[in-house]
């Protein structure tokens, strides 16, 4: 009786598979042929009760999976609830080949370094970037949050030489992610870390100083290879006044002043210090460095100026620093990552399931 029941289930599954396959093949070929000119394309829209950047996510088009991909499955894929695709914008339900996904985002983030560092240094920097990207994606996927800050460049838009070189690096690390206490981390990064003019030390900003949240693996660490962004960028505060002239014109109000003595390792000012006309500022608009990483002084004419360093939030891995460590010290990607993310471990997440899709389900049924 048991064998008859098993036989009946298998027969029913095979019959269902045949029906679905017959219906899927014409649809798959139609997908390849494209939509006839002038005919509107209808895309599925799911109800998602959230917004991204103020935009209603229910209005975002979803990336649709090819029928044959669903039937046969794919060995190495990653599905993101939201992802920016170059040339398309923000999309929902994005399912990509894992290697292509990591290559496309790595190229967007760090694609140009192959032209100014050695091939071996570029490989290690790309590996570090790919592992950080994979970890970031898995973290945001796990918690259902958006990875819309990243931009995926479709691999067919990447120059062949760059694609080949980056893909070599990605394939070597595609199964690796960063973990802390066994859980995948939010592996944030920025273009460049800051510079502490008091100590002469370049360094990153901690999660606590940047966002008010103490994250054990996002601590402030030294990042010595930031020269590319060490050119002073300034915003003039009170263009038409010297300090004395400005303060004399504001009788009874607080002077223009700034205390930059309380800094973390990277030179990021740790709390409200800048005062202008009685107001304190935590974040000042129009700065390319979104954290405090500045000195306050005057130019040759006595005009108040603010000088700041770095590019980006300065938390986690510095791309400039990672390239420098690889090029100047010969560091491998593991050393680079473990330097920037305090106390982390590397973990293999496997290469995906070669038994995916509907037929993967069938194979499990017959085991």
At which residue positions do the language-model features occur?
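Conserved, single-site charged/polar hotspot
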Residues: 2-367
